[in-house]
Amino acid sequence: SEQQCXXK
């Protein structure tokens, strides 16, 4: 999840 996303 956060690995691909921005920095949530």
Swiss-Prot record:
Tree of life domain: Eukaryota
> What is the name listed in the Swiss-Prot or TrEMBL entry for this protein?
Unknown protein 10
